[in-house]
A protein has these predicted regions:
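Domain-scale recognition of functional cores that engage charged ligands
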Residues: 1-159
């Protein structure tokens, strides 16, 4: 149980949308080295353009809902934005497997988790999640038009 209510006046700093939202999400990826995080490079730190571009995705740092993402990136795509390389990342492509049975074709799933880490506590606490189903090349509304059994919701979990 938290020591405060959301409606109480408290001394906190909120992470605001959009700039801090974008900075915290994609901006941190090149700094995280883990088998659970796809390899990610700031474009302006790229030593050479990879030969296997079919395994990479080009993403603008400050975009939302997949806008500006080049899923099938080409050398000209990279060369075009290279002058603005400080606001782009190149990320290893993640292949989502269609494992959720639906009435027509299996869907891919993504589960995003949000944790809060209360000061003085040893671990963060899971507070909410976002579950999304997709049948498109990417997860998001623009990539799932005219598809059924796709979209987002909150998932229930045991405490």
């Amino acid at each position: 149980m938290l020591q405060w209510n959301l409606t109480d006046e408290v001394n906190v700093e909120w992470v605001c949308h959009p700039n801090w939202f974008f900075r915290i999400s994609k901006y941190t990826l090149p700094f995280i080295k883990s088998r659970y995080v796809p390899e990610t490079i700031f474009l302006n730190e790229l030593k050479s353009i990879p030969e296997d571009l079919e395994n990479w995705v080009l993403k603008p740092l400050y975009s939302f809902a997949g806008h500006g993402v080049k899923f099938n990136v080409t050398r000209p795509d990279i060369e075009e934005v290279m002058p603005h390389g400080d606001v782009f990342i190149l990320q290893k492509k993640v292949t989502y497997k269609p494992v959720v049975a639906t009435l027509d074709e299996p869907a891919k799933a993504e589960l995003r988790l949000m944790y809060l880490w209360e000061e003085g506590k040893t671990r963060p606490q899971l507070v909410i999640n976002l579950a999304r189903l997709s049948k498109g090349v990417m997860i998001g509304v623009d990539y799932n038009k005219n598809k059924t059994w796709v979209g987002g919701t909150v998932g229930y979990y045991e405490k």
